[in-house]
Amino acid sequence: MKQRLSLAQSALEKLSARRGNTWYPIFHLAPPAGWMNDPNGLIYFNGRYHAFFQHHPASAYQGPMHWGHATSTDMLHWQHELVALAPGDKYDRDGCFSGSAVDDDGVLSLIYTGHICLEDRGNDSIIREVQCLATSHDGIRFEKQGCVLTPPEGIMHFRDPKVWHEDGSWWMVIGARDASDNGQVLLYRGTSLRDWHLEHVLAHSAAGESYMWECPDFFRCGNFHWLMFSPQGMNPSGYRFRNLFQSGVLAGNWKPGSVFALKGVFEELDYGHDFYAPQSMLAEDGRRIIMAWMNMWDSPVPTRSEAWAGCLTLPREVFERDGRLCQRPVREVESLRRKCQPLSPVRLHGVQLLTENVQAAELLVTWHTVDSHAEHYGIRLGEGLRFYVDNQAGRLILWRYYPEEGLDGYRSVELPDTEYLTLRIFLDRSSVEVFVNDGEATLSSRIYPQADSRQLSLYAAHGDAILTDGTLWMLT
């Protein structure tokens, strides 16, 4: 593998030399160049946070999957490390697909899916997927240990292992597609990272509901266990499931040796255009943190012209509130704040310019919804992004319009039935993330404003809106 890693690193360095920065993020993790998708192997290990990710170092297009690697002390300022894994062995010939990382008695261990195309590359109707192990004593350079788990009889799609240690055993959840083309998550138990046996199917889709459940994660938070996964093949329903693929959670009760007793239905984790394959880790202080890929399959990728593609969301702390899994930005984001601009309370009618040129910012605003009678009101960035309250529809709308990049359309969530609406909005060069009422809902989307279209404004149309409080920070 050493030669393949060297070639991958060399290709990445050559591509990095011509990377453009028009839309390259200031405070989100993105590849130094090349392609990025799923976050992998999120872990706090030996005093640093590690984020691995699906990566093609040779181009800004999806290719044979490698594992990129970055480390941080605060989950915000990332240092890119050497490419961690490169495909090419008999068990991962066509890709080192997604997986997780654990601390095995001081050894940083990666458990990942080895992907093999049995016919043409890219034809996923005839593939073989197995689970593999790689280990490192310094946390940077990894040695492959080979295949440690093969799929059950009759299962071809078998990927994205998430591993943890509990009750004296190793546990693993894996996404799968059964013989009837229904998604499911399999639960395994191990005496070591090399010795596994199947416990049972932890959860599965209803017949015809979705054909594959990718990137599962399983953890306790608050009063419930949460199965987090990314189903493929769900049909749109009203305002729901509008992206090509979804990501969300099932809540229930579980303990080692028991079944997962569901307590509700599948709930999406994010309602924007771009959120997929979230993975969790425990922070140094025990907070449960998730990060996701902030893109969507089959969406336009304008940054390819700048030799890079893909980024991750802000790290988010998840917590349970009234039986729902909520998200808020990790408190470390406050360290990014620089220039502070308080916003005075105002009865807004028309447009109020906040700043002429936003590269990276956090906007915190509170609206008095009961006395805000405008047809719609909120924020806008240039001519291409609006996030607003639609009083007639009773919804919060995230609308983006970049026709030159092939992007147009909106996503939305129901307007909370509260007297006050608090929005915490993070803008980076090519992304927006909105947190509604301290994590009650989130919306994440990629945006592509031109240099002359970064004016940030508040507005109210066809009536007044009452802003009760607000602050704008520039971020670095």
UniProtKB/Swiss-Prot annotation:
<dbReference type="InterPro" id="IPR018053">
    <property type="entry name" value="Glyco_hydro_32_AS"/>
</dbReference>
<feature type="binding site">
    <location>
        <begin position="159"/>
        <end position="160"/>
    </location>
    <ligand>
        <name>substrate</name>
    </ligand>
</feature>
<feature type="binding site">
    <location>
        <position position="54"/>
    </location>
    <ligand>
        <name>substrate</name>
    </ligand>
</feature>
<dbReference type="InterPro" id="IPR013189">
    <property type="entry name" value="Glyco_hydro_32_C"/>
</dbReference>
<comment type="function">
    <text>May prevent the potential hasard of excessive sucrose accumulation.</text>
</comment>
<feature type="active site">
    <location>
        <position position="38"/>
    </location>
</feature>
<keyword id="KW-0614">Plasmid</keyword>
<dbReference type="InterPro" id="IPR013148">
    <property type="entry name" value="Glyco_hydro_32_N"/>
</dbReference>
<dbReference type="InterPro" id="IPR006232">
    <property type="entry name" value="Suc6P_hydrolase"/>
</dbReference>
<feature type="binding site">
    <location>
        <begin position="97"/>
        <end position="98"/>
    </location>
    <ligand>
        <name>substrate</name>
    </ligand>
</feature>
<dbReference type="InterPro" id="IPR023296">
    <property type="entry name" value="Glyco_hydro_beta-prop_sf"/>
</dbReference>
<keyword id="KW-0326">Glycosidase</keyword>
<dbReference type="GO" id="GO:0005975">
    <property type="term" value="P:carbohydrate metabolic process"/>
</dbReference>
<dbReference type="Pfam" id="PF00251">
    <property type="entry name" value="Glyco_hydro_32N"/>
</dbReference>
<feature type="binding site">
    <location>
        <position position="214"/>
    </location>
    <ligand>
        <name>substrate</name>
    </ligand>
</feature>
<keyword id="KW-0378">Hydrolase</keyword>
<protein>
    <recommendedName>
        <fullName>Raffinose invertase</fullName>
        <ecNumber>3.2.1.26</ecNumber>
    </recommendedName>
</protein>
<comment type="subunit">
    <text>Homodimer.</text>
</comment>
<feature type="binding site">
    <location>
        <position position="297"/>
    </location>
    <ligand>
        <name>substrate</name>
    </ligand>
</feature>
<dbReference type="InterPro" id="IPR001362">
    <property type="entry name" value="Glyco_hydro_32"/>
</dbReference>
<dbReference type="InterPro" id="IPR051214">
    <property type="entry name" value="GH32_Enzymes"/>
</dbReference>
<feature type="binding site">
    <location>
        <begin position="35"/>
        <end position="38"/>
    </location>
    <ligand>
        <name>substrate</name>
    </ligand>
</feature>
<dbReference type="Pfam" id="PF08244">
    <property type="entry name" value="Glyco_hydro_32C"/>
</dbReference>
<dbReference type="InterPro" id="IPR013320">
    <property type="entry name" value="ConA-like_dom_sf"/>
</dbReference>
<comment type="similarity">
    <text>Belongs to the glycosyl hydrolase 32 family.</text>
</comment>
<dbReference type="GO" id="GO:0005737">
    <property type="term" value="C:cytoplasm"/>
</dbReference>
<dbReference type="GO" id="GO:0004564">
    <property type="term" value="F:beta-fructofuranosidase activity"/>
</dbReference>
